[in-house]
Each structure stands twice: as structure tokens, then as C-alpha cells.
């Protein structure tokens, strides 16, 4: 663990509390560190679109080989080659830099160490293992260019991920962040949210002022951790009940709503629909959860809403065969419903 800076003193009791809170927070939210912001000050070494296109077109650059390695690792489930290419420190720096409060340096060290330990146990790219993971094209999200991949898993699960890259030497690249289209968020943004909650819990009013809920989540940290444990145990009904008992501001926290959604998806169709409608009230931008909402609209036969979301996804990805197929299915089912209604009307 990194040495505790003398210029950033904390009492022994507060340090002990900090260590415990870091472990609780990272454990509670580890499931969303990928899938998982605020503007930060870390300098980005990302290659831009022009640079990425140029290297893809140049066989000597090695970028095509890099893409092939990623695809092979994901499909076979042999994740270690890709894990070694992730610049963990850069992601953590992007998530934690820019907070100038007494105690922040120590908090950053402990948060970073705990997060690395979590990654060592589970891996940053673990959710991709064994999926059909295919490179599509260079694409920019939130002003950061990257390599866009389509991820198709079991039960027709579909998502898209963009890997931002740095070039550390000839034919040598590192993954500097991962954008998840299904959540409209980079890994560093997910971590940033968790880090700010930790600041609110430990750094007094200055820390609380950094969060949108002014520390409400931090005040419920132990309860959120308990909910997370219920989720890991597969106690879906208990998770939903526990979330409903949280303060309103905490219920609407993005991470808590994702925990609630995961439980609802395993509990009942009705519960899932309720959570997604609550999500839309808290986060009206459909592109913050586009793939889940597209499926939600399809289930409810809200064809126009489903078409709107899928069409926007097609625009953002630059086109995709599976999304195009989904759009065709929407149009077919809508036309079928119209025909059935016309036939019924004619009979009457």
C-alpha cells in the first residue's frame, strides 16, 4: 500500500474509519465498476479518431493485431492477455484527481489500493469472457475516440463497448478506459461517482458538497452495502424491499437503481417494468440506459418508443447488423398489430 503522506494527516481513528469505508464502498459497488461522471482533471493520452484510423490502415502499426488479440481473448474466455493491457493507474487517476481537500491524498491511495484488489480478484474485463466480441469501427463518445466493439452474450444479450487507447511505444498499446454504451458511462466515471460518495462520507462538509445528493448516499453507506450483499446472495425480493426502505435521494442514486434493476430482472416482469419507469423519472435521457429501455418498450409493445431508441443507437454506433435486425422486428410487429386491428374492425 502506498505510504501515507505526512502533509495530509489524519487521526488514527479517522484513518481506521476511512479504511473500513473504502472496503465497504468498493465491495458494495464492485459489480458496477465496469458497467459502470463528473468532469476530472487528468490529462488524456487517448489516441484521437485520425490517429486510430491511420494506425488501423497501417499493418506495421500493430493495431490490427491488437484488435485481434482482444477479440480472441473475449471469445475464448482467456482474459489475462487483455487484462495486462489495461492501464489501471490511468483509469484510477482519471477517477480520483482534482479534489483539493485535506485528507484527499490518503483517501485516494486507499481507494486505489482497494479497487486494484477488487480487480485482481475479478478482472476489469470479466463480463466479456466467453462472449461474441467483435470490432466494429472507430467511434467517439463523450469527446473521446476509441475502438467500438459489439458484445453478444447468452440469451441474446447485446451491448457495445468502446476502448480508448494510448500508444506507449512502437506496436505497443494500452487500454486507458472502457465506455459502456448500455450505461452511457466510462469505467472512470463509475469509479468517480463512488469516489465522491467516499469523500462525502469521510471529508466533512467539503466532501459532501462534491456530491449531487450532498452526502445522502454516504449517510446510507452501510445500508447500501447490506443491499449489495443481498444481491450477491440472490435474494431478489429482499433487495427490492431494502431499496424501498432507503431515503428517496438514495433510492434515486444511479448505482442503487442499477442494483434494484438487477434484482427486479430476476424477480418478475412487473417489478422490472416498475424499476425502469422509476429510472426514467430520475434519468429522463433514454440514452443513459438505452438497451434496457429498448427491450422494455418492446415488452410493452410501445413500438414507436422502441423504434426511437434503436434508431438512436444505430446512429451512435455508426450502424450494426443486430440493431438493424431489431429495428426490422419492431416494424414487423407494429405492422402486424395494425393489420390485426384492421381485420378485427372489418369483421365488426
Residue ranges of model-derived segments:
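Alpha-solenoid helical repeat scaffolds
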Residues: 255-260, 288-295, 322-326
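Long, contiguous interaction/recruitment modules in multidomain scaffold/adaptor proteins
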Residues: 103, 107, 111, 115, ...
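Short, well-ordered alpha-helical segments enriched in acidic and aromatic residues
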Residues: 66-110, 242-248
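Short, low-complexity N-terminal intrinsically disordered segments enriched in polar/charged residues
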Residues: 40-76, 210-223
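Short coil turns that delineate tetratricopeptide repeat
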Residues: 250-251, 284-285, 318-319, 348
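Alpha-helical repeat scaffolds
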Residues: 237-246, 270-281, 304-314, 337-348
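Residue-level detector of the short coil/turn that links helix A to helix B
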Residues: 234, 267-268, 301, 335
Amino acid at each position: 500500500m502506498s505510504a501515507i503522506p505526512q502533509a495530509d494527516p489524519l487521526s488514527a481513528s479517522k484513518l481506521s474509519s476511512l479504511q473500513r469505508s473504502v472496503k465497504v464502498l468498493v465491495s458494495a459497488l464492485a459489480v458496477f465498476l465496469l458497467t459502470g461522471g463528473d468532469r476530472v482533471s487528468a490529462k488524456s493520452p487517448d489516441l484521437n479518431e485520425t490517429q486510430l484510423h491511420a494506425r488501423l490502415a497501417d499493418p506495421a502499426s500493430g493495431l490490427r493485431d491488437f484488435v485481434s488479440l482482444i477479440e480472441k481473448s473475449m471469445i475464448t474466455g482467456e482474459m489475462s492477455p487483455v487484462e495486462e493491457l489495461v492501464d489501471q493507474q490511468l483509469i484510477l487517476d482519471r477517477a480520483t484527481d482534482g479534489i483539493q481537500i485535506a485528507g484527499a491524498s490518503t483517501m485516494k491511495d486507499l481507494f486505489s489500493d482497494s479497487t486494484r484488489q477488487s480487480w485482481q480478484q475479478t478482472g476489469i474485463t470479466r463480463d466479456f469472457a466467453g462472449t461474441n466480441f467483435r470490432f466494429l469501427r472507430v467511434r467517439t463518445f463523450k469527446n473521446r475516440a476509441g475502438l467500438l466493439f459489439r458484445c453478444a452474450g447468452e440469451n441474446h444479450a447485446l451491448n457495445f463497448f468502446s476502448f480508448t487507447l494510448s500508444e506507449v511505444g512502437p506496436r505497443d498499446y494500452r487500454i486507458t478506459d472502457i465506455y459502456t454504451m448500455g450505461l452511457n458511462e466510462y469505467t472512470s466515471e463509475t469509479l468517480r461517482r463512488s469516489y465522491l460518495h467516499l469523500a462525502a462520507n469521510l471529508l466533512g462538509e467539503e466532501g459532501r458538497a462534491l456530491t449531487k445528493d450532498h452526502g445522502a448516499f454516504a449517510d446510507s453507506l452501510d445500508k447500501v452495502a447490506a443491499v449489495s450483499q443481498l444481491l450477491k446472495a440472490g435474494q431478489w425480493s429482499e433487495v427490492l424491499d431494502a431499496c424501498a426502505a432507503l431515503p428517496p435521494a438514495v433510492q434515486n442514486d444511479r448505482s442503487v437503481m442499477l442494483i434494484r434493476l438487477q434484482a427486479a430482472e430476476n424477480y418478475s416482469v412487473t417489478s422490472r417494468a416498475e424499476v425502469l419507469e422509476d429510472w426514467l423519472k430520475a434519468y429522463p435521457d433514454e440514452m443513459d440506459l438505452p438497451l434496457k429501455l429498448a427491450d422494455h418498450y418492446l415488452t410493452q409493445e410501445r413500438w414507436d418508443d422502441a423504434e426511437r431508441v434503436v434508431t438512436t443507437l444505430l446512429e451512435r454506433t455508426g450502424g450494426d447488423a443486430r440493431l438493424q435486425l431489431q429495428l426490422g422486428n419492431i416494424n414487423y410487429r407494429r405492422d402486424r398489430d395494425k393489420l390485426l386491428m384492421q381485420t378485427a374492425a372489418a369483421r365488426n
